[in-house]
Each structure stands twice: as C-alpha cells, then as structure tokens.
A protein has these predicted regions:
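Hydrophobic transmembrane alpha-helices that form the pore/transport pathway of multi-pass ion
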Residues: 2-80, 273-317, 327-343
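Juxtamembrane and boundary regions of transmembrane helices in multi-pass small-molecule transporters
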Residues: 54-143, 309-359
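Hydrophobic alpha-helical transmembrane segments in multi-pass membrane proteins
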Residues: 56-61, 97, 164, 168, ...
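Interfacial loop-to-helix junctions that mark the boundaries of transmembrane helices
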Residues: 86-94, 152-156, 176-189, 249-255
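Long, contiguous bundles of hydrophobic transmembrane helices that form the permeation core
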Residues: 100-177, 188-212, 334, 341-344
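Core transmembrane alpha-helical segments of multi-pass membrane transporters/permeases
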Residues: 158, 180-201, 208-242, 257-269, ...
Length: 359
C-alpha cells in the first residue's frame, strides 16, 4: 500500500505535464514496485490516472490554458479573465478526472479493493511473484529490464537517484513557470548527460557507459514505434472526419436537460476513438458552448459551466484509456507493462468513473 500511495502522490505532484508525469512516475517507481510485488498493470494504471486527470484540474497547466483559449469569444466569455473564471467554476463539475484521481487513492490505500482483470493481475504478482503475465510484451526492451548493476562499484543513492530526480523536476517546473511550458525533453536530456558524467566519476569505464546508452535507446524503440503508429491513426481519423461525424450524429438528441451528459458521452467516444483529447476539445468546445449559451440567453449559468466541464472530462476519458493515446502509451512504457494488458486492466476503472460522471 505504501508504494502505491507514494506513486499516487508523486503523480499528483508532477501535475504540470501529462506526458512527463506517467513516464517519470513509472520509471522512478518501477524497481520499487517490483520488489513490493505490485503488478506492472497496477503501476501503469496509477501513473496514467495521475497524468491527464490531474493536469486538466489545475489552472496553471497547458491543458487549462488551451481549454480557456477555446472559450474566449463565445457568449459572454470575452477576455482571458472571463475564461479563467469559467475554468475555476468548472473544476467541481469536472467529475470524471476528479473521480479518476480519487479512485486511484482509494485503491492504493486499500479502501476500495481491486476488481476485474486488475484483481487477477495483482493476485498473480503477490502469489506467484510475476509482475508481468506469462507471454506479456512489455513496452520497453528486455535488455533494460534484465540489466545488472556494474560490479565493483558501490551504489551512490544521491548521485544515481536523488540528484537526477531533483534535476528533472527542477528543470521541468522551472521552464514551466518561466517559459510557459515544461521542457520535459530538455530535462531528461540534461539529466542523461549528468548521469553519464556521474557514472564516469564513479569509476565506470566509458565503454560500459556507451553500452548502457545503446541498450537504453534500443529498449525505447518499441514505445517510439507504437507512438508513431498511434499518431498515424490519429491523423487518418482526422482526415476521414471521424470526430465531426460523431458530433453531427448526436446533434439531434441535444436538449437543455441532457445537454451536459450527451456532450460528455460524445466527447468520450470521440477521444477514445481518436486518442486525442486536445483534438476533441478543439472540435467539441466550439459546438458545446454556443449551444449552452443559446439556452441561457448568453448568460454564464451552471448549464454553460457544466457543458464546459463535460467537454474537458470527456476528452480526458479518451486520453486516459484509449490505446491510441500518447499518455496511455507512456504509462505502459514507464512502468514496463504490456500495453494491451495496461489498457484492459485500466478500462473497468475508467468506465466506472465515466458512468459515475455521466450520472
């Protein structure tokens, strides 16, 4: 329970980037969770559920800025301050991400017991010591998993763990607050350079360092390939007009009484099918908000706020559980989980939160 709670808190703390968070949490907690006999599916679920669901609730993230920019100019939302006020009012009504984050904490603490495929995965890990199922294909190369520590060198926790983690968080947070976006790629790059120099200082031969770099690059190829394929499918879906078709098909069912719920379902389906939450926002928000304002005579009422939250929550649902989503792929990569196993074990939890949010 303690390891799972640490992973949960760590994911919430790294709120500023939905891409950085699952990769960071999975990588940092991977070996620790293995020793605690926590399945890879469980770790990837925790990492994934504290990524996009957290980012969309915090008003100082790229997600918030993007959602607010889509609202400016619609109805009585004239300025950025108006959009920010709308976003803040929508947080308590953004049920899906709230439920998703809370459910992780309840499960990690043992208050809510695992169910569905996740229960079987956890039972396998605890009773058989298998954090991966037999025949699973983890989204990182086996070379990285099976890599052994260099013999003859005493491990230095400060240089090999504490400093790199602090560097990544400091650079990512620093660039987020100073430049407006978290430079996660640069954070990892500079940390890798530091790690290479640190290994040399500790007496590890240059040849061994370069072999380690090669193994790391090789192990990342499966994840990069899957991401490229996911982006290709997303682009194809956009070209075919899948999202627009879904919206037009549901337009006849929209009435004030069910408007937020229908918008939420449409956004969920669209985001899951395309794997793109931001693409869903871009298509749904310009339709949902004008519809809501049409029923309120241009006034910012609870209906408008609820529709804004429905688009945000529905988009996060797709980003959270679609196998095409980059954050879902990165969660599998960071935890070293089989991607399909991660999706299958997480889906019942996501659907539970989705049904509760719909109700």
């Amino acid at each position: 329970k303690g390891t799972q709670l640490v992973a949960w808190v760590l994911g919430i703390f790294v709120y500023f980037s939905d891409s950085f968070s699952p990769l960071f949490v999975g990588t940092v907690m991977r070996d620790i969770s293995d020793r605690a006999k926590i399945s890879k599916e469980k770790l990837s679920y925790i990492a994934d559920s504290t990524a996009a669901p957290v980012s969309v609730l915090v008003p100082v993230t790229g997600w918030a800025a993007y959602l607010m920019s889509l609202a400016v100019g619609v109805g009585c939302i004239v300025t950025q301050d108006d959009a920010q006020a709308l976003f803040l009012k929508a947080i308590p009504l953004n049920f899906y991400p709230l439920f998703a984050v809370i459910l992780v904490g309840l499960i990690a603490s043992g208050i809510v017991k695992d169910f569905g495929p996740m229960k079987k995965a956890e039972k396998r890990a605890m009773e058989e010591g298998k954090v991966l199922r037999d025949g699973a294909t983890p989204l990182i190369g086996k070379e990285l998993i099976e890599m052994k520590p260099y013999e003859g060198i005493k491990p230095n926790v400060a240089l090999n763990f504490v400093v790199p983690v602090v560097m990544i968080i400091t650079i990512a947070l620093g660039t987020f607050f100073t430049l407006g976006s978290a430079k996660t790629m640069e954070a990892f790059l500079y940390t890798c350079i530091f790690m290479a120099v640190s290994m040399l200082i500790q007496g590890i031969p240059f040849k061994e360092v370069m072999e380690t770099v090669t193994v790391g690059i090789k192990s990342g190829v499966p994840a990069v390939t899957l991401l490229a394929l996911a982006y290709s499918v997303n682009a194809l879906s956009k070209t075919m007009g899948t999202a627009n078709f879904i919206v037009s098909s549901c337009s006849g069912f929209l009435t004030p009484a069910v408007l937020p719920a229908i918008i939420f379902v449409v956004a969920c389906i669209m985001a899951f099918a395309t794997g793109s939450s931001w693409g869903t926002f871009a298509i749904c928000m310009p339709i949902a908000l004008p519809l809501a304002f049409a029923y309120t005579d241009g006034q910012l009422t609870t209906l408008v706020v609820a529709c804004f939250a429905a688009v945000a929550g529905g988009g996060v649902f797709g980003d959270h559980c679609s196998p095409l989503s980059d954050t879902t792929i990165l969660a599998s990569t960071g935890a070293g989980a089989d991607h399909i196993d991660h999706v299958k074990t997480q889906l019942p939890y996501s659907l539970t939160c989705g049904v509760l949010a719909f109700i």
